[in-house]
Amino acid sequence: MRRLTAFGLALLLLASGVARGEPAVTLDPQQSQVFRAWFVRIAQEQLRQGPSPRWHQQDCAGLVRFAANEALKVHDGKWLRANGLSNRYLPPELALSPEQRRLAQNWQQGGGQVGPYVNAIKLVQFNSRLVGRDLNQARPGDLMFYDQGDDQHLMIWMGRSIAYHTGSSTPTDNGMRSVSLQQLMTWKDTRWIPDESNPNFIGIYRLAFLSQ
């Protein structure tokens, strides 16, 4: 990917957001709330159990795609067993139309194309809307987007912590990370501090199919 300044990338994302408009299929406010609960729970399970063998393309954007796709599925006994979960302390089940269940298989890829794969920048450019750069505006399941020049990175705001995948893994490190906001705000590498004064922190994004 060609190198962009953070300011240039922000302008590009803003312009694409204006051109994109609202998705044809969305979740209503109640569905959006339940989706967030499942999305966060599935991301938490990747931290607790390690990445699911059903999760392909394990990186920061892959975590978002996987959690969104699994959140939109029917969470029956077969699904629970496949994901190592019991039926205790789960969010309520999502009542969705067939079109809504396919939302995370039909990401906007640009140029009128849709499909199950998008990278980090296309997740925010074509499939999310900017909320702002103040973390007080973030809701659980919102995305924190960073531009580091040659690379772009996503983290998930979990409500009380932040989850992400580093983009690489080894036999002794599955790449999953969870940090508190306090930890991130005092990070030695200041490029990752989610503060309005940090030009590498582009902002908080919300999946476009969520109505709130």
Swiss-Prot record:
Q: Which superkingdom?
A: Bacteria
Signal sequence range: 1-21
Swiss-Prot/TrEMBL keywords: Signal
The record's section on Pfam families has: DUF1175
Q: Report the sequence similarity comment from the record.
A: To E.coli YfaT and T.maritima TM0986.
Can you say what this protein is called? Uncharacterized protein PA4490
Gene source species: Pseudomonas aeruginosa (strain ATCC 15692 / DSM 22644 / CIP 104116 / JCM 14847 / LMG 12228 / 1C / PRS 101 / PAO1)
